[in-house]
Structures are given as C-alpha cells and as structure tokens.
C-alpha cells in the first residue's frame, strides 16, 4: 500500500519530512524501497516553503534489505521487494501525527493525507509539475483511482499527496536528513561552512556549499527539526557523509532518514515548447534580440525570440555572480535557457550559450598616408590631424567577447530543488536512475 501526505509546515517552522520520520517510528509495516520526497511545481502560489510531498510504499519486506536510517538509536531497514498488505489504520496513525506536529494555525497550511492500494497513473504527477491543480480535481482523481483521503482545513495537501503516489521515479537522486526535535542546537556559521565543505568531498554529492557567497547549503532554517540535509546520487555514500559530518561536528541528533527524491532531475522542465504559459517551466533555445538591461535591485533582463515567440529572460539579484555572464549577452547570441515562466518573465535557473555573435565597433579610419587616426568632423566626415586629408568611410574593428559558448549554472545559493546542475548532468547520462552499480 501507499501513503502520502503534504502541506504540514509553514515559513516559520516544522518540516513535512519530520512527520515521515515520526511515522516510520510508529508504523508496523515495512518500507519497500525508500521513503520518497517529491518536489512539485515550484511556481505554485500556495506553497508554504519547498513544495515537497512525502510518500512511502508499505508492505511486508522480502529478501535483501538496505539501511534507510537510524531512528533514536534503532536501525531502520527497507526492502527491495515486498508483499502488499493494506492496513487502513495507517491513515489514522498519520492523522494523529498531522494533528500533533502540523502548523495548523498558519493560514496557508492545509494538510492532506492519501492512501492507496496501488500507485496512481503517472500523468497526474506530470500535471502537478506543470500547472496548478484544484482541490476538487485532486479529490476526483484520487477517488477514481480507488484511493482514500483525509483533509485538514481546506485539505490542499491532497494535491501533492496524490502526485507523490503518482511519481514514476524514472530519474532519481537521494537526500539524507538528520533531525533533532524540536530544533537543533545553534551552530555557528564558520562551523556550518566547514562541515558543508566536508560534505562536498563525498562522491556524487551536490549543492552542498557556496563558498563565494558564504552559504552552507546543507543547513536549512534552524526553526525546523532538520539539522542538515546532504543530497547525492548514492545512498551508501550519503550515509557515510552524514556520519562524518555528525562526528566531525559533534552534532547531537535524534534520527537520520534517507529519501528517494526527484530533486535535481529537471522533471519540471518542458522541452522546447511551441507556446509559453504562466507557471510552467521550460527549456527554450532562443536568439537574443536586444542588449540586456538592469533595473533597481540588481535584476537583469534580456529580450529573446524562440519558436514560441518573443519573451523576456530574467536573472534576478539572488542569482549573484551568474548575472555577470547574463549581462554580457548580445543580440545574435543563441542561448538555451532553463527556467520558470512567471509574471511575464522566464526566471533563468541555468543557461547554455550555444554560440556568440560577432560584434564590431565603429572607429575613425587611419590616414593611409600618415598612419594616424583621423578625427570625426561630422557625419561621415573624418580628417587627418597631420595632413588634413579627408575620408568618408569609418573603420570597423571586431570586439573580443567577454563570454564564450558553454554551460552556466546559477550559484548554489540560488538553485531550486528540481533544477539539475550541469555538474551532475553527465552522471545521469551514465547512470540514469542514479542507482549504485
């Protein structure tokens, strides 16, 4: 059977994943595979923080088992295979946890729980990445597929819960999270940076640290029970990385849990659309048609044209040094942008410069007799300051471009959960499902 839940946190506290940690401590069924953390449309206006739903496949484990984590000193195992066992009581175990831990006083927190004997059709997952789904639409979908749901307040969380059960897990990464309830001890920034750099030394991990911007990315909001989270391609490597961070940092923790995720998979990206729609995320190859311009706040914009028509690509202030490259684009450049289209702009998450145009500057001609640079005396009137000879045609010199074809990521501090950094792209090509050989 499958259980999923969503929308239990708020901007000021809690983390939906912590309810999974508590659920796994209480449930009497085995975990088949890994618990799942599924990120959905990053543009949805109702999201409380990271727009991630949780799900888990439950049953009676068979055969080889693997370590998922450690729950208050007890090792938690998962199984590659299992016999299905449907126990509707897990819905009410989860209900108690939602009532105990959710940020129900926050106006935009509207939890939802879903259970099902079978996974849902994957088309619903892709819809939840691409557009805004109504609560009534989610109710109908879950009911039509023989699932059951439980709503708190408006119950908007059933939308993400249904999508988490629909996720086909065709491209995957992992994240290991360490917890301390109600929140971890305060860790100074210098120590966070040191431990984030340490995590970054482990094979296949990513988005751990941004040294240039002094951002220790593995450490989230200290108001939640999450101490740190390390993302990567190999669960056994993540377990070793977490142990090293805990030991070297002398970190007091309650539990660790490894999740199978769709983070850094680009699942939200629609490839080369014919039409651009609001709240969707795209990969768009376009030609630059104007020079970039900036506005107050350090945001940069550039007009571009693709087969879907004209649009404005944007690099906002949080993308930091990425804006320097973005600002050097010129008319005629061909660029593939990746990003989300909101409020009339494509908010760029990364870009690949395919080709750069040749740029020429207009200069006064050299005197053929004196080899001296002439001076402009008016429109198409150039005179040699030495001999006085006149010329009516300017010279043009090619300007060396400050950028070149290549792949450009925004810095770690600005990366979104679903966006795949170019640095791990080759790993997906050789190991599509990010599973250990």
From Swiss-Prot:
Documented EC number(s): 6.3.4.22
Origin: domain of life: Archaea
Position of the signal peptide: none
Enzyme class: ligase
One term under GO cellular component: cytoplasm
Reaction(s) catalysed (UniProt annotation): cytidine(34) in tRNA(Ile2) + agmatine + ATP + H2O = 2-agmatinylcytidine(34) in tRNA(Ile2) + AMP + 2 phosphate + 2 H(+)
MF-aspect GO terms: ATP binding; ligase activity, forming carbon-nitrogen bonds
Family according to the record: Belongs to the TiaS family.
Protein name per Swiss-Prot or TrEMBL: tRNA(Ile2) 2-agmatinylcytidine synthetase TiaS
Organism: Thermoplasma volcanium (strain ATCC 51530 / DSM 4299 / JCM 9571 / NBRC 15438 / GSS1)
Name of the gene this protein is made from: tiaS
């Amino acid at each position: 059977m499958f259980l999923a839940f969503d929308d239990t946190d708020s901007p000021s506290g809690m983390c939906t994943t912590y309810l999974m940690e508590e659920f796994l401590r209480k449930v009497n069924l085995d975990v088949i595979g890994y618990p799942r953390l599924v990120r959905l449309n990053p543009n949805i206006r109702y999201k409380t923080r990271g727009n991630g739903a949780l799900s888990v496949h439950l049953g009676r484990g068979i055969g080889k088992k693997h370590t998922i984590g450690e729950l208050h000193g007890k090792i938690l195992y998962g199984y590659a295979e299992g016999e299905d066992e449907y126990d509707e009581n897990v819905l009410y175990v989860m209900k108690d946890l939602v009532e105990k831990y959710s940020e129900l006083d926050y106006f935009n927190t509207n939890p939802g729980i879903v259970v099902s004997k079978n996974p849902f059709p994957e088309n619903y997952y892709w819809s939840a990445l691409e557009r805004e789904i109504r609560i009534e639409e989610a109710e109908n979908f879950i009911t039509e597929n023989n699932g059951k749901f439980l709503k708190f307040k408006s119950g908007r969380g059933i939308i993400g819960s249904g999508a988490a059960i629909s996720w086909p897990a065709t491209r995957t990464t992992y994240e290991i999270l360490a917890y301390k309830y109600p929140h971890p001890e305060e860790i100074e920034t210098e120590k966070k940076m040191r431990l984030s750099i340490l995590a970054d030394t482990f094979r296949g991990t990513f988005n751990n640290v941004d040294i240039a911007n002094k951002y220790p990315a593995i450490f989230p909001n200290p108001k939640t029970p999450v101490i740190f989270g390390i993302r990567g391609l190999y669960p056994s490597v993540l377990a070793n990385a977490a142990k090293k961070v805990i030991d070297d940092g002398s970190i007091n923790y309650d539990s660790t849990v490894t999740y199978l995720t769709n983070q850094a998979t680009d699942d939200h990206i629609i490839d080369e659309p014919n039409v651009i729609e609001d709240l969707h995320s795209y990969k768009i190859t376009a030609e630059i048609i104007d020079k970039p311009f900036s506005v107050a706040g350090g945001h940069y914009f550039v007009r571009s044209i693709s087969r879907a028509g004209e649009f404005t690509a944007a690099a906002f202030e949080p993308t930091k040094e990425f804006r320097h490259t973005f600002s050097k684009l010129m008319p005629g450049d061909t660029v593939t942008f990746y990003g989300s289209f909101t409020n009339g702009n494509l908010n760029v998450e990364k870009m690949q410069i395919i080709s750069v145009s040749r740029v020429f500057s207009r200069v006064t001609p050299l005197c053929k007799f004196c080899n001296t640079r002439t001076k402009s005396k008016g429109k198409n009137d150039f005179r040699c300051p030495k001999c006085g000879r006149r010329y009516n045609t300017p010279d043009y010199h090619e300007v060396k471009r400050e950028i070149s074809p290549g792949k450009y990521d925004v810095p770690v501090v600005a990366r979104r959960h679903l966006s795949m950094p170019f640095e791990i792209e080759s790993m997906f090509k050789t190991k599509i499902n990010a599973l250990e050989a």
